[in-house]
């Protein structure tokens, strides 16, 4: 397809959430507490994991990584969205748009990889308890964590480079509340079929491989739990995995809805991505703290030390 002979775009206009004209301040008041709770909840988990010696285990090491991810993931899109909901500028520079897309997919793919690693950690702990500390030693844990970040960087670099090597020389109105591939590609003044195919394949392949590995881990875990003779033993083993399973279900629904539909629905995609960017990162701390006695105990200890909660 021939590139149009026009001036190159230097900035984009984010049109925001469709069909919400006149509701900006209402949405701001609604979304701001979600974002604040996301930051507060994940900081709390991170502080609990770092300050409690009992939580210096592989499981909580990866949970701490997930908390860092959740804070970063929300912060990629939410501050700009909240600013224009307040009535400030909807403009975003070309470079900022590139950065927003890169970090959105960088941190988004890390979630898939990290959930896969966390499933493997639970599989090792339940299926090979006597060898757990040997298999999941500190060096392996660090290597797995670094690996998730490196793979996320590679994945995001591919998608970002394919999206922004295309020329943008026509309309600059992004029909979305942040810079993402489905909203940007229609603005390109060149053939986008390669970028569409690669992004669909890349996201689909990563999601499928991670999901299958998680499914394999939890199939083995379920078999092992059912073989435990005592009811209390089965209950304790299941309680360590149930929070992780809930978080996985919350993560994979939006991925399928937004990126893996043959004919995406823009309105549905926007609603789902708001839930993914705001609600998902806020729910993870709640899921893990409400169902985990060790995290709750660590948080209570911190509050006791700071004098916010009296000793019982």
Curated annotation (Swiss-Prot):
Regions of this protein lying in the Cytoplasmic compartment: 48-57, 119-139, 219-239, 288-312
Keyword tags: Cell membrane, Disulfide bond, G-protein coupled receptor, Membrane, Olfaction, Receptor, Sensory transduction, Transducer, Transmembrane, Transmembrane helix
Function description: Odorant receptor.
Biological process (GO), any one: detection of chemical stimulus involved in sensory perception of smell
Keyword tRNA-binding: no
Pfam family, one: 7tm_4
Gene Ontology molecular functions: G protein-coupled receptor activity; olfactory receptor activity
Positions of transmembrane segments: 27-47, 58-78, 98-118, 140-160, 198-218, 240-260, 267-287
Top-rank lineage group of the source organism: Eukaryota
Organism of origin: Homo sapiens
Stretches of the chain found on the membrane's Extracellular side: 1-26, 79-97, 161-197, 261-266
Membrane-topology annotation of the record: Multi-pass membrane protein
Disulfide feature: 97-179
Descriptive protein name: Olfactory receptor 10D3
Compartments where found: Cell membrane
One GO cellular component term noted in the UniProt record for this chain: plasma membrane
């Amino acid at each position: 397809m021939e590139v149009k002979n026009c001036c190159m775009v230097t900035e984009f206009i984010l049109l925001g959430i469709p069909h919400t004209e006149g509701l900006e301040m209402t949405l701001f008041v609604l979304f701001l507490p979600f974002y604040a709770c996301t930051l507060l909840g994940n900081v709390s988990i991170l502080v609990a994991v770092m300050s409690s010696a009992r939580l210096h285990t592989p499981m909580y090491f990866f949970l701490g990584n997930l908390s860092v991810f959740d804070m970063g993931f929300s912060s990629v899109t939410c501050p700009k969205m909240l600013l224009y909901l307040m009535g400030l500028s909807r403009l975003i520079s070309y470079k900022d748009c590139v950065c927003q897309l890169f970090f959105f997919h960088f941190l988004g793919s890390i979630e898939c990889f990290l959930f896969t690693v966390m499933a493997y950690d639970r599989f090792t702990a339940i299926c090979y308890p006597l060898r757990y500390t040997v298999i999941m030693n500190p060096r392996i844990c660090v290597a797995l964590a670094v690996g998730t970040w490196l793979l996320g960087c590679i994945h995001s670099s591919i998608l970002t480079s394919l999206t922004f090597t295309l020329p943008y020389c026509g309309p600059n109105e992004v029909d979305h509340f942040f810079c993402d591939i489905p909203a940007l590609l229609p603005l390109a003044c060149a053939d986008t079929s390669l970028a569409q195919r690669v992004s669909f394949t890349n996201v689909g392949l990563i999601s499928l491989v991670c999901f299958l590995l998680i499914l394999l881990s939890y199939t083995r875990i379920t078999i092992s739990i059912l073989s435990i003779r005592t009811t209390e033993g089965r209950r304790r083993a299941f309680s360590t995995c149930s929070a992780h399973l809930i978080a996985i279900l919350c993560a994979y629904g939006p991925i399928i809805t937004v990126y893996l539909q043959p004919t995406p629905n823009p309105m549905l995609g926007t609603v789902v991505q708001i839930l993914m960017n705001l609600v998902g990162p806020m729910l993870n701390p709640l899921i893990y703290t409400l169902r985990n006695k060790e995290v709750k105990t660590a948080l209570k200890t911190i509050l006791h030390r700071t004098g916010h909660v009296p000793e019982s």
